[in-house]
């Protein structure tokens, strides 16, 4: 068996097209332009690249992009003052603070300062609680993207056995909650799980998100399963020590011979994250104005 390769890049392009259509409708019908504000504290090179990508994609779909770059020595009080200003700004429907922030700032406190209705990263305890209780909130972008890929590949997830490896607040827990909402039977696996390989072999849906390169081997995977690889590890390239390569949590070449479908790294889950950030911003905009939520962009 050779697995179907799930093309996250192509699917994300489709999500962005839906976002752009909804942005155009909001502008032409209601005179509203969704706005996303991104705050960057310090000069982390990787963060600067991520922020630039978010700005570019935000503008490409027709939304307003508000970028705020603050010096590394910015105090908590000054950062909170900016967040309060963005919370109160009716032109801003989504707020994201790019992490990591400098060590003197507390990331949890930063997230807590953002209005949950504008927390388009879905990281606040309010949005996490809404998800856990089955209520309507804003969902963390990467789990939302994975769910979109799974729905597209499998349709109805009811009754399927799903195993999520990793229990982080950022991904694992919300991924498990989303799968429960879809009526899958969910097992949350982690570093203390006994006989992890045996647990994984039960899964119709296997989601790996622990950051250990090629941990999931072919004999961990049920034949025909759908495998979603969320892990990213950068390692020296075996053929050129001056270059690096990205590896996922799954031994891709081996598992692709067993699975029914699999996401590659890169090009699988990664592109979905920003696409879902844009989707969440449109959803937040519609909710702020009491308008119907766009089809296919929210859960």
Curated annotation (Swiss-Prot):
EC number per UniProt: 1.5.1.5, 3.5.4.9
GO biological process per UniProt: L-histidine biosynthetic process; methionine biosynthetic process; purine nucleotide biosynthetic process; tetrahydrofolate interconversion
UniProt xrefs under CDD domains: NAD_bind_m-THF_DH_Cyclohyd
Sorted UniProt keywords: Amino-acid biosynthesis, Histidine biosynthesis, Hydrolase, Methionine biosynthesis, Multifunctional enzyme, NADP, One-carbon metabolism, Oxidoreductase, Purine biosynthesis
Disulfide bonding pattern of the chain: none
Pathway it works in: One-carbon metabolism; tetrahydrofolate interconversion
HAMAP family, sorted: THF_DHG_CYH (MF_01576)
Family stated for the protein in its record: Belongs to the tetrahydrofolate dehydrogenase/cyclohydrolase family.
Assembly mode: Homodimer.
The name this protein goes by in its record: Bifunctional protein FolD
Organism: Dinoroseobacter shibae (strain DSM 16493 / NCIMB 14021 / DFL 12)
């Amino acid at each position: 068996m050779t697995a179907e390769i799930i093309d996250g890049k192509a699917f994300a392009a489709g999500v962005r097209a839906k976002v752009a259509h909804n942005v155009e409708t909001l502008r032409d019908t209601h005179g509203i332009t969704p706005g996303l504000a991104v705050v960057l504290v310090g000069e982390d090179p990787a963060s600067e690249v991520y922020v630039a990508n978010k700005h570019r994609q935000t503008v490409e779909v027709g939304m307003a992009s508000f970028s705020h770059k603050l010096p590394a020595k910015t105090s908590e009080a000054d950062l909170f003052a900016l967040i309060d200003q963005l919370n109160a700004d009716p032109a801003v429907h989504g707020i994201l603070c790019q992490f990591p922030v400098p060590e003197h700032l507390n990331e949890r406190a930063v997230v807590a300062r953002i209005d949950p209705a504008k927390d388009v990263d879905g990281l606040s305890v309010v949005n996490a609680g809404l998800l856990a209780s089955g209520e309507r909130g804003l969902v963390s972008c990467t789990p939302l993207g994975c769910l979109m890929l799974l729905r597209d590949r499998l349709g109805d997830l009811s009754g399927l056995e799903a195993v999520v490896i990793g229990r982080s607040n950022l991904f694992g827990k919300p991924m498990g909650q989303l799968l429960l909402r879809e009526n899958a039977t969910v097992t949350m696996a982690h570093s203390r799980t006994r006989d992890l390989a045996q647990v994984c072999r039960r899964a119709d849906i296997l989601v790996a998100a622990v950051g250990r390169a090629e941990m999931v081997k072919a004999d961990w995977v049920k034949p025909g399963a759908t495998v979603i690889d969320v892990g990213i590890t950068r390692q020296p390239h075996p053929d050129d020590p001056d270059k690096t390569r990205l590896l996922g949590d799954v031994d891709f070449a081996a598992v692709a011979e067993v699975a029914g479908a699999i996401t590659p790294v890169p090009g699988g889950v990664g592109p979905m994250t920003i696409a879902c950030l844009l989707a969440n911003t449109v959803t937040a905009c519609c909710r702020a104005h009491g308008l119907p939520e766009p089809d296919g962009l929210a859960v």
